[in-house]
Amino acid sequence: MELGLFLMPLHRPDSFHADTYDQDLNLMEVADDLGYTESWIGEHFTMPWENMPSPELFVARALGVTSRMKFGIGVSLLHMHHPAHVALRIAQLDHLARGRLYFGIGSGSGTEWNKEIFGVDTAREDIHSQMMEAVSVIQQFWAGKPFHHKGTFYDTGIPEPKGDTLFDYHMIPFQKPHPPIAVAGSSPSSGIPVS
């Protein structure tokens, strides 16, 4: 039997953040020693009980206190990030993890705070279409070949090499073709169809 963890994480809002991260890292170390096979770390920007705005940073640190456990980003809210940034960060993290990484995506919960702080309406009806477009663009970046994508939400891509060896797109994942992708969903309409 395999055991895993899902860390929101939950901490009292009046807790000192540095201490809560140390507690969570200690939990990762103990779980790894006990044989837990994976841990998923949530992404939460505006929830005082769940102080984890960058699960990638936490996972990068947790990799140093574990040796076997795999980590999942649970989940990256793609509508809150540009797909090029996500592709680069997750590919780099996959190298740091040497393949001990899962990439989770989801729409999250729409809060007024996210809308007011980031200017992103997470309750819009086309949020799932944006997620589908974003994951497609991320996978194109991970392929590492020149492409241009002009879609409903994004106009981006990898340009053709210009003969300059100083600048070029180079960050493809450690795992081939990319880290396993998990899609979160709490209802039939909250996930996205992916293959």
Question: Residue spans of the language-model regions?
Answer:
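Alpha-helix N-cap and loop-to-helix initiation/capping positions
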Residues: 16-23, 50-54, 81, 85, ...
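Conserved N-terminal glycine/acidic-rich loop preference
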Residues: 27-29, 39-41, 80-85, 99, ...
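Active-site beta-loop-alpha junctions enriched in small/polar residues
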Residues: 8-10, 44-46, 76-78, 106-108, ...
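N-terminal beta1-alpha1-beta2 module of alpha/beta enzyme domains
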Residues: 1-73, 179
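Internal, glycine-rich beta/alpha segment that forms the wall or movable "lid"
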Residues: 85-195
